[in-house]
Regions:
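Active-site core of glycosidic bond-cleaving carbohydrate-active enzymes
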Residues: 1-147
């Protein structure tokens, strides 16, 4: 699956069978798909072949970067932002993770003192799953685990 879906920069979201029954990549690419691959695909983003993907995760996909590839479907609050934060954490990019937490949740906290379900003014203004961010903040202050 990794070999079929990685195009040298991004992981394609899915494949479809052609008339002969062969699987062919459909060409759809989403930001969340990159995080799923990074977190659950058994790959090591430090490998040279994933350099461009790593650059996209740490740069192009960053909130407000303005460098986003127009083919990439961006993440939504749940679950995409959380997978982004977890990916940055596991990559050791704690300063980027902290910046993203501030960028995404800062206005929520300033407005209501809570973390919300969505980016905007609909849904829950005190969403339980948003507390996951606290676990990342605590973990980012701990020394790395030794394998």
């Amino acid at each position: 699956a990794l070999a079929q879906s990685f195009d040298g920069r991004y992981f394609l979201d899915h494949a479809q069978r052609d008339a002969a029954g062969e699987l062919r990549p459909a060409g759809d690419i989403s930001e969340i798909g990159q995080y799923y691959a990074a977190l659950f695909g058994g790959l090591d983003l430090r490998e040279p072949r994933y350099r461009r993907l790593r650059e996209s995760i740490t740069g192009d996909f960053a909130p407000g970067s303005g460098a986003r590839d127009p083919r990439i479907v961006p993440v939504n609050a749940f679950i995409g932002v959380y997978l982004r934060l977890e990916t940055l954490f596991r990559m050791g990019e704690h300063s980027l993770m902290l910046r993203d937490i501030e960028d995404f949740f800062g206005q929520m906290e300033a407005y209501t003192g809570t973390l919300w379900e969505n980016r905007d003014f609909h849904g829950s203004y005190d969403h339980g799953f948003a507390s996951y961010v606290a676990s990342l903040l605590i973990a980012s202050r701990q020394p790395p685990c030794q394998p």
